[in-house]
């Protein structure tokens, strides 16, 4: 088996495991299902910033890099059967990976900003958090995982 194929398999396993871990973190540790108010969301981000930071790395940044490896491994494996389709799928996978990496990095940079700002002006921190969240949601495909859906097709 080729090295790229092995790394692609490892990347796919990482992606599956990181999703399972992420679900547990979001539901059990962060309890996001009970948060209905933006002020609660901000408070949770301030109180559990280490967990949030680590989760952003796990679920967005590292996941994005794994997605690049998986996309390239799938391209290499399937390019002879449908070369044009695999070129499109690989391009979408790499674009999706880039948006996930950017989203995770922006979220972590924004987290540092709101934590610092919250100590001085909680109201301004809340407004800043809403702006940062809009940006990271846009980058991270929070509108239904359009890129992920296209890539999976």
Task: List PLM regions with ranges.
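Hydrophobic, aromatic-enriched alpha-helical segments typical of multi-pass transmembrane helices
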Residues: 1-153
């Amino acid at each position: 088996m080729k090295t790229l194929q092995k790394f692609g398999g490892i990347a796919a396993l990482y992606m599956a495991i990181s999703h399972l871990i992420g679900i547990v973190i979001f539901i059990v540790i962060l309890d996001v299902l009970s948060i209905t108010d933006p002020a609660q969301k901000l408070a949770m981000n301030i109180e559990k910033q280490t967990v949030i930071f680590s989760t952003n790395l796990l679920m967005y940044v590292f996941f994005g890099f794994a997605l690049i490896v998986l996309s390239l491994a799938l391209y290499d494996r399937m390019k002879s059967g449908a070369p044009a389709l695999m070129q499109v799928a690989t391009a979408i996978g790499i674009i999706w990976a880039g948006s996930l990496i950017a989203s995770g990095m922006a979220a972590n940079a924004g987290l540092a900003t709101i934590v610092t700002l919250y100590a001085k002006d909680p109201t301004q921190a809340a407004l800043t958090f809403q702006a940062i969240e809009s940006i990271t949601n846009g980058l991270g495909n929070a509108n239904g995982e359009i890129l992920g859906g296209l890539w999976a097709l």
